[in-house]
Amino acid sequence: MWKWLHPYAKHETQYHLCGKLSPFFGAIAVLLLAVGIVWGLAYAPADYQQGNSFRIMYVHVPAAIWSMGVYGSMAIAAIIALVWQIKAAHLSMVAMAPIGAMFTFIALVTGAIWGKPMWGTWWVWDARLTAELILFFLYIGVLALYSAFSDRAVGAKSAGILCIVGVVNLPIIHFSVEWWNTLHQGASITKFEKPSIATPMLIPLILCIFGFLFLSIWFTLVRYRVELLKEDSKRPWVKELESKLK
């Protein structure tokens, strides 16, 4: 296995491989999101309680799910980087951070828009909302800490430690509606129970969830290539690449 993986340890190989894979993931993401959002907005029936305001769910729920998923992936990468000193893991963590921050911001904004007609206010200091806001600040903190040091290795290590510590916030976000009496509704899709939403509403939601997953992979591959160029900016292969682009 290691013999097969060894050629991919080179940053130049990783750069070109990500370039080949990113259009594939991008195309799937666009297709899934286009079908899911159009289906959800135009063809899914109105909710019997919320009317048409529920349709923002097709952006809010996937963004909220993958705001946590991306952070969890960053934490795994940070652990790998700190334990086994694998530079690619540090670069992956940094590459994912802006994407996770973007998803978290989308989740917060769409949640506020959805909450206005439901709760009568744009924002309440609800347990889940507050924990999601903390998640956004964690993303910003990871990026800020990484950029705060002139030595990229020190910055990556410091940001990785913060990322790992911040993982404690993920179960708080997920279980807050069960642990405390909150305004936020419970999960519409559960692993062991029948979904609480109708199938015509559920199918486009699932498409959008997978669409956001492929979107996150696509953006991560693009961002990872950028981080590789920064890391190896003085290496011959990057200089050669720059000369070809001129």
Regions found by a protein language model. Give the residues of each.
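Polytopic transmembrane helical bundles with strong interfacial aromatic enrichment
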Residues: 1-246
